[in-house]
């Protein structure tokens, strides 16, 4: 497997020309910014010594506030206080309303169905809100480093799709930041721990943040980070713990389900405070809306146990993808504030058979890894031997005749990557080809996800199979896909960059992988049937053209035998007997062998007519 050097050409710098770079952990609940100073990566604090910046923005007509100031307004002005905006990135309004029906915001749909949040400052999309958080982090870094940033590395969940990654890059540009690279959060954590410990072997990175869960299985060897497999859930995190506990408190307190937004916010704040307290205490007293009661750690554990189990199921799938057993994992790194919950650490330790590493603050480890990566990419460590390989989560391919999916880049292929595959025309005189880009693990188009469509026109009018079209898939370091189709003889080409308007849900991602395993045998049979039907159609199409042109070369008996064979093939091709179709194709080939030879002889005679032997 090829290993990719992180350092980019032309970015090396002399020591006295050190460039300023930062790593940003743009989190669902909290965000951080870190940098490398005097050879050490560290997170940067605000004037009050706080390293975490709540990912909350409060909008007013005259301006906005970010972080702690914004969070204090959450209970007072819920409609104008936007939190957990990361969950909204890259999703349609319909998807958001279905998944998060209790959000206290008023939405409008843009022309293409994307969400616009109604605030006192006007209609704002999630990209703009994220940009305001990034601006606050960049301002902290600029002040701490006494200079403008030359570039940043921003972390994203490993399961973020194209739309979510592109939205993150757009937010950074809106904030005036130069993005060196988007980096998967678990991979950033591996960088932080790998450089510090220098250990070699298989490592699992269990990342349970506020809004997302990711599991990565990596192999470390002599400074090389190879991502063997990734998995996770793009809509599962500590926020879900909070909401479950808030609902439990609401039921105990007898508060109506559809109470006003202010009460809902008070419930959520009480749940968050109780969750934090229960990490150290066996029970906690809760006061909310005039009600007082006790919540025990045991009750909390019972509420969240199903969610923790879901994360472990994803861990099991990732291990299977990586081809390793749990007992082969040397170390387990936990990332994200939600891993402070005792039940999480306990269950993770039981699953992997060893206690997880916690020597680096789980809230800071991702930002620290991003800072190390940014320091390399900006050119401050040109001689670094650190290597990094990421993977794509689902296979990418094309629709072919018969509704089949031809995989071009398999799932878990390391990125960046470019793969090409040649295709040809199906019909005589075909001058255009529709390119349908697919994502998924199944064999048929109907069972996979459509990413994009575009057309290649200007193909030379040649017999079926005469034109050769090369389709190239390219996935960049940020996981964004571009597809190019080129007719090789003329050089005519068409391309598209895949930026879907919204992404897959967590259940869709999990089910696509699960279904590919559950229906593997069924899919193979369906593919074999579809392939034989396509071949039958091709044979009949070719035969009809040949008969129309040269039927005079056949005797009446020969023509009847060919017609009978073709009719039988046409009939069995309507059924689902693969062997019968295959035998019928062979019979047509047998009945037309002499006819094909005569046509070839006739073509040669026509080509030689009027030419001497010497000319030949």
Curated annotation (Swiss-Prot):
Lineage of origin: Bacteria, Pseudomonadati, Pseudomonadota, Gammaproteobacteria, Enterobacterales
Domain of life: Bacteria
Name under which the protein is recorded: Chaperone protein HscA
UniProt keywords, alphabetically: ATP-binding, Chaperone, Nucleotide-binding
Family the entry assigns: Belongs to the heat shock protein 70 family.
Keyword Repressor recorded: no
PANTHER family in UniProt: HEAT SHOCK PROTEIN 70KDA
PROSITE patterns noted in UniProt: HSP70_1, HSP70_2, HSP70_3
Chaperone among keywords: yes
GO molecular function: ATP binding; ATP hydrolysis activity; ATP-dependent protein folding chaperone; unfolded protein binding
């Amino acid at each position: 497997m090829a290993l990719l050097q992180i350092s980019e050409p032309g970015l090396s710098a002399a020591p006295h020309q050190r460039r300023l770079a930062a790593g940003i952990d743009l989190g669902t609940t909290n965000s951080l910014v870190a940098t490398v100073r005097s050879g050490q990566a560290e997170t940067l604090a605000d004037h009050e010594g706080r390293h975490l910046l709540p990912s909350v923005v409060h909008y007013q007509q005259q301006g906005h506030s970010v972080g702690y100031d914004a969070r204090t307004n959450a209970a007072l002005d819920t409609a104008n206080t936007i939190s957990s905006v990361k969950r909204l990135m890259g999703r349609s309004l319909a998807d958001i309303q279905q998944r998060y029906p209790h959000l206290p915001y008023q939405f409008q749909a843009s022309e293409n169905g994307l969400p616009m949040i109604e605030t006192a400052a006007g209609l704002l999309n999630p990209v703009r809100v994220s940009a305001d958080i990034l601006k606050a982090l960049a301002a902290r870094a600029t002040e701490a480093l006494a200079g403008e940033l030359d570039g940043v590395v921003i972390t994203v969940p490993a399961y973020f799709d194209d739309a979510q990654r592109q939205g993150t890059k757009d937010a950074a540009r809106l904030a005036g930041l130069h993005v060196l690279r988007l980096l998967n959060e678990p991979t950033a954590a591996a960088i932080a721990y790998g450089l510090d410990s220098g250990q070699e072997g298989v490592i699992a990175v269990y990342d349970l943040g506020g809004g997302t869960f990711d599991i990565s299985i990596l192999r470390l060897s002599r400074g090389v980070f190879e991502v063997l497999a990734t998995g996770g859930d793009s809509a599962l995190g500590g926020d879900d713990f909070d909401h479950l506990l808030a609902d439990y408190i609401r039921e105990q307190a007898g508060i109506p389900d559809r109470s006003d937004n202010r009460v809902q916010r008070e419930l959520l704040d009480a749940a968050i405070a109780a969750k934090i307290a229960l990490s150290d205490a066996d029970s906690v007293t809760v006061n909310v809306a005039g009600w007082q009661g006790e919540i025990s750690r045991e009750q909390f554990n019972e509420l969240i146990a199903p969610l923790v189990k879901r994360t472990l199921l994803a861990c099991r799938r990732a291990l299977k993808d990586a081809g390793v057993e749990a007992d082969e994992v040397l170390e387990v790194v936990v990332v994200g504030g939600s891993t402070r919950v005792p039940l999480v650490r306990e269950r993770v330790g039981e699953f992997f058979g060893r206690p997880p590493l916690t020597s680096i603050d789980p809230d800071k480890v991702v930002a620290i890894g991003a800072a190390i990566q940014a320091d390399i990419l900006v050119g401050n460590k040109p001689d670094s031997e650190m290597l990094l390989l990421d993977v794509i989560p689902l296979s990418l391919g094309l629709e072919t005749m018969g509704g089949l999916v031809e995989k071009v880049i398999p799932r878990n292929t390391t990125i960046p990557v470019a793969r090409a595959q040649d295709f040809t025309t199906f019909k005589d005189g075909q001058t255009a080809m529709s390119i349908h880009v697919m994502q998924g693990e199944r064999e048929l188009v109907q069972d996979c996800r459509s990413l994009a469509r575009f057309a290649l026109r200007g193909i030379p009018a040649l017999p079926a199979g005469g034109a050769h079209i090369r389709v190239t898939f390219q996935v960049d370091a940020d996981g964004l896909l571009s597809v190019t189709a080129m007719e090789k003889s003329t050089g005519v080409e068409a391309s598209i960059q895949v930026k879907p308007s919204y992404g897959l849900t967590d259940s869709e991602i999990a089910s696509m992988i699960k279904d590919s395993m559950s229906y593997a045998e069924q899919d193979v049979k369906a593919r074999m049937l579809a392939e034989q039907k396509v071949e039958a159609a091709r044979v009949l199409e070719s035969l009809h053209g040949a008969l129309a042109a040269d039927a005079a070369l056949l005797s009446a008996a020969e023509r009847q035998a060919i017609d009978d064979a073709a009719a039988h093939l046409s009939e069995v091709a309507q059924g689902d007997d693969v062997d019968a179709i295959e035998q019928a194709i062979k019979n047509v080939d047998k009945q037309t062998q002499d006819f094909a030879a005569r046509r070839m002889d006739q073509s040669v005679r026509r080509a030689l007519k009027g030419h001497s032997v010497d000319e030949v």
